[in-house]
Amino acid sequence: MPLLVEGRRVRLPQSAGDLVRAHPPLEERARLLRGQSVQQVGPQGLLYVQQRELAVTSPKDGSISILGSDDATTCHIVVLRHTGNGATCLTHCDGTDTKAEVPLIMNSIKSFSDHAQCGRLEVHLVGGFSDDRQLSQKLTHQLLSEFDRQEDDIHLVTLCVTELNDREENENHFPVIYGIAVNIKTAEIYRASFQDRGPEEQLRAARTLAGGPMISIYDAETEQLRIGPYSWTPFPHVDFWLHQDDKQILENLSTSPLAEPPHFVEHIRSTLMFLKKHPSPAHTLFSGNKALLYKKNEDGLWEKISSPGS
């Protein structure tokens, strides 16, 4: 069954702006979200999701109470939630393979959902802006279309994307919202930024920059974050890129050079350095081809734990 708003099937294709104008509650929700002040989210109880990662958990989780992601310019952050059991998935989509990613998101929630119980699937889409290359617009269209193709009824509750998440300054366009968090217990979604993007922030970012596909990073049953084992081919021309100035890196390695947050270039440089240092991660980072496992400690912070059999 299709994507629904207020119980009615969404007419596609249409722009995000036209869609919310046809459904005033959607427009009002986007307006309220844009109007929020940004909350700084601390590391306690947080599971931070990087680009091309997804994480899913439920209110039964004793370790994780918040899922979040930020630094989305043309990317979209997607939250899918089952209202019956509270199972919640957050993912940071960049349009690499939306057709494959939406079924992954759906299956992650279905692995929790007892379909005999009451409740419905609700989706929230946030991110993107009116960028020159129309990458945000394309991703919005892809996500709406793919959710509409799924077998289950999916209720579109929040749509704050592309032109609905756009602000203009000196004739340049920027996103209003770069990041969001969702409270697993209360289902509240709010504007957020994060100081702590770990664990293993560089390793996870390197996998994405090296072209890795969307992956699930968290096992809610064991309450463990699982990283790897990853493999990638050596990053092409890594020395060339490391010798370029900030302007060249911004213009060539960003989908939206004018709209990136201030730390973007520093983040790309450190990720390139990591890729140069670890051209074959299977040998240097994943001893015995074992995943790196992390679990929250009593203070709500990530702590590395031993892999089984190590």
UniProtKB/Swiss-Prot annotation:
It is found in: Cytoplasm. It catalyses: N-terminal L-asparaginyl-[protein] + H2O + H(+) = N-terminal L-aspartyl-[protein] + NH4(+). One of its GO terms (biological process) is memory. Keywords: Cytoplasm, Hydrolase. The keyword Repeat does not apply. Inhibited by micromolar concentrations of copper and zinc ions. The record marks C75 as: Essential for catalytic activity. One of its GO terms (cellular component) is cytoplasm. Optimum pH is 6.0-7.5. N-terminal asparagine deamidase that mediates deamidation of N-terminal asparagine residues to aspartate. Required for the ubiquitin-dependent turnover of intracellular proteins that initiate with Met-Asn. These proteins are acetylated on the retained initiator methionine and can subsequently be modified by the removal of N-acetyl methionine by acylaminoacid hydrolase (AAH). Conversion of the resulting N-terminal asparagine to aspartate by NTAN1/PNAD renders the protein susceptible to arginylation, polyubiquitination and degradation as specified by the N-end rule. PANTHER family: N-TERMINAL ASPARAGINE AMIDOHYDROLASE (PTHR12498), PROTEIN N-TERMINAL ASPARAGINE AMIDOHYDROLASE (PTHR12498:SF0). Monomer. This is Protein N-terminal asparagine amidohydrolase.
